[in-house]
């Protein structure tokens, strides 16, 4: 049995006396693409810093390739690299920024050629950018240079923290393409935290949900956030922006996150659910995307501003003529809702 790339056991991390991450057990395989989804403050950045061995967890076990490793230890420093959401560039030329990691490793062979190739990965021409000072770069260009500085190392693991959050659309596409090319060309394991959950669903082998410092689910669940209200009839639920009612079981707290795992499409059109505990919602298909892992189609549906997804066979998409912009009805069983 192959040793997982990461193995985490009973890990907790505390920041200024406040628990920010708690993982009972988690294993990440090598060579794949793992997406991490969660709202702001859920612990995504903390998780990536720990996985990047930038920080040491407060307690628990974090194994890399079957062995414990300390922050910045030699056994991980040359194999794992993290691109933070706001990466730091030195006040030097683009060439010196990209080449820095190789120089501190005393790997200076064919340096200019390797910098040129790394820049080409992120869509930058070395003739135009190599001698440009870092302060003369736009936000998107700076992010791409920072990524090139990681890619030149051909890392075994590349951790990306919201890599496209603060860049223009062109830079975002180039950053995404470069990361995926590294995975294809070198077998680099990608761990990506992003608000672009639709892109993550398309490219990831596994998608993990993180909420309030805890992992739950494997990507096929729908997560609906509070607040939740107690209605006059004694039921709990959430009134959506267009007046639709999303009924739920009693939440542990009014701001809890509901995990809705079994949402069904009702004949591809407006219709009624049959079960006594079924509830229906009406929404609009906004996107259809092929899932990398399953070969099925993930349909993104916007219900009064709440994004939901369901996974359907390609044949059903064709037979029911489903397409972006079409109105559909969904059904779910409200007593089966779990809480995070």
Residue map of PLM features:
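Helix-to-loop junction immediately C-terminal to a conserved catalytic motif
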Residues: 52
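Glycine/charge-rich catalytic "coupling/switch" loops of P-loop NTPases
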Residues: 242-289, 318-340
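ABC ATPase NBD coupling module
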Residues: 67-81, 104
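The feature captures the beta-strand-to-loop junction immediately N-terminal to the Walker
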Residues: 37-39
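Conserved ABC ATPase signature
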Residues: 133-137, 141
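Conserved ABC ATPase "signature" region
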Residues: 110-128
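Catalytic Walker B motif of ABC-type/P-loop ATPase nucleotide-binding domains
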Residues: 158-162
């Amino acid at each position: 049995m192959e040793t997982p790339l990461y193995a985490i056991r009973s890990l907790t991390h505390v920041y200024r006396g406040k628990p920010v991450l708690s993982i009972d057990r988690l294993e990440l395989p090598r060579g794949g693409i793992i997406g991490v989804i969660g709202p702001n403050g859920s612990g995504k950045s903390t998780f990536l810093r720990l996985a990047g061995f930038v920080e040491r967890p407060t307690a628990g076990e974090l194994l890399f390739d079957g062995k414990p490793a300390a922050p910045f230890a030699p056994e991980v420093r040359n194999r794992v690299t993290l691109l933070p959401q706001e990466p730091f560039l030195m006040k030097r030329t683009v060439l010196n920024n990209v080449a820095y990691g190789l120089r501190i490793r005393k790997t200076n062979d064919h340096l200019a050629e390797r910098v040129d190739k790394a820049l080409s990965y992120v869509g930058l021409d070395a003739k135009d950018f190599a001698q440009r000072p870092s302060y003369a770069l736009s936000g998107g260009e700076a992010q791409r240079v920072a990524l090139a500085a990681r890619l030149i190392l051909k890392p075994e693991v590349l951790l990306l923290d919201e890599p496209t959050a603060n860049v223009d659309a062109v830079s975002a596409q180039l950053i995404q393409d470069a990361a995926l090319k590294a995975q294809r060309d070198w077998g680099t394991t990608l761990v990506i935290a992003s608000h672009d959950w639709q892109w993550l669903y398309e490219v990831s082998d596994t998608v993990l949900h993180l909420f309030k410092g805890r992992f739950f689910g494997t990507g096929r669940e729908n997560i609906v956030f509070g607040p939740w209200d107690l209605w006059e009839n004694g039921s709990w639920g959430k009134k959506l922006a267009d007046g639709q009612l999303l009924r739920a079981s009693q939440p542990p707290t009014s701001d809890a996150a509901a995990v809705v795992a079994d949402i069904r499409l009702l004949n591809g059109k407006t219709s009624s659910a049959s079960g006594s505990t079924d509830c229906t919602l009406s929404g609009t298909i906004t996107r259809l995307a092929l899932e990398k892992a399953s070969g099925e189609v993930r349909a993104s549906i916007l219900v009064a501003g709440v994004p939901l997804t369901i996974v359907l066979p390609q044949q059903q998409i064709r037979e029911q003529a489903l397409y972006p912009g079409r109105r559909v009805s969904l059904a779910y069983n409200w007593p089966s809702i779990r809480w995070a």
